[in-house]
């Protein structure tokens, strides 16, 4: 069975953890006790829906603050492919963690909030993927439910992204653009009737179609995020 690692990127509150939680839920990767825990926590917070972001926030601080700080690696599978998803933080101060999570990825999903469009953190994460040489980029315009699933909103964002790619993108990279709503499972596992103007595939189908390249050239590589050294004359910095 094929194995592919995909990193997530995007600004804070763009919905990365919710998207991954949705993928886990819809592919049957969550156990019954995990679902029960999410149901209880969602109800306790007064939500009328499942807060699937809880499926990925592992640290106590993350659970308390409702944010992602460290990189979480999540596993799920379909009949023909296994996935490792790196859930990376969106806050600017945790960009280093995002770089670490993306450093071994074969593809990246860059999420955007449909209400905000392309912002500074979107561009920053895009540049990181180009620097790391990631060959497959999916721009996922999330929260389309909050803009009434309007095609013109998606097209405006896509045009801005295309301009960014044309100016700064690597030529040997494949770029994809997809509108979705992770919260309501629109265009995640199956094509959405509310987004029927979009003729492309659902997100999971797109993820399953990404070519898996051999990583033999990287065998033996050990990624290091930060080196702590003694403060001496030999190592003064």
Which residues fall in each region the model found?
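Residue-level signature of catalytic and energy-coupling elements of molecular machines
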Residues: 13, 19, 38, 66, ...
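Signal for well-folded cores of large energy- and translation-related assemblies
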Residues: 24-28, 39, 43, 60, ...
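P-loop NTPase switch module centered on the Walker A-proximal segment
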Residues: 2-93, 105
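Conserved Switch II/interswitch segment of TRAFAC-class P-loop GTPases
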Residues: 81-83, 88-94, 102-126, 130-155
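C-terminal effector modules of nucleic-acid-centric enzymes and ribosome-associated factors
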Residues: 5-8, 146-149, 153, 163-166
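Switch/connector loops and helix/strand junctions flanking conserved nucleotide-binding motifs
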Residues: 16, 32-33, 119-120, 146-151, ...
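Conserved catalytic-core segments of large NTP-driven translation/proteostasis enzymes
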Residues: 155, 162-237
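Alpha-helical scaffold elements adjacent to nucleotide-binding pockets in ATP/GTP-utilizing enzyme cores
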Residues: 19-23, 37, 97, 121-128, ...
């Amino acid at each position: 069975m094929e194995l592919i690692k995909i990193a997530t990127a995007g600004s804070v509150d763009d919905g990365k953890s919710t998207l991954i939680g949705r993928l886990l839920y819809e592919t049957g990767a969550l156990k019954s006790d995990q679902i029960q825990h999410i149901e209880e926590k969602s109800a306790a917070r007064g939500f009328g829906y499942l807060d699937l972001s809880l499926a990925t926030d592992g640290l106590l601080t993350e659970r308390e603050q409702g944010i992602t700080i460290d990189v979480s690696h999540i596993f799920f599978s379909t009949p023909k492919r296994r996935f490792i998803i790196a859930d990376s933080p969106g806050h600017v101060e945790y960009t280093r963690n995002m770089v670490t999570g993306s450093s071994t990825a074969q593809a990246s999903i860059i999420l955007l909030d449909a209400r905000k469009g392309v912002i500074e953190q979107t561009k920053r994460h895009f540049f990181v993927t180009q620097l790391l040489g990631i060959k497959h980029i999916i721009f996922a315009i999330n929260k389309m439910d909050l803009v009434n699933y309007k095609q013109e909103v998606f097209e405006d964002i896509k045009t801005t992204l295309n301009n960014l790619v044309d100016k700064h993108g690597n030529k040997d990279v494949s770029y994809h653009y997809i509108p979705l709503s992770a919260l309501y499972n629109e265009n995640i596992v199956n094509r959405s009737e509310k987004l029927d103007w979009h003729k492309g595939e659902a997100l999971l189908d797109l993820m399953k179609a990404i070519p898996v390249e051999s990583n033999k050239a990287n065998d033996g590589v050990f990624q290091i995020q930060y080196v702590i050294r003694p403060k001496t004359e030999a190592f003064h910095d």
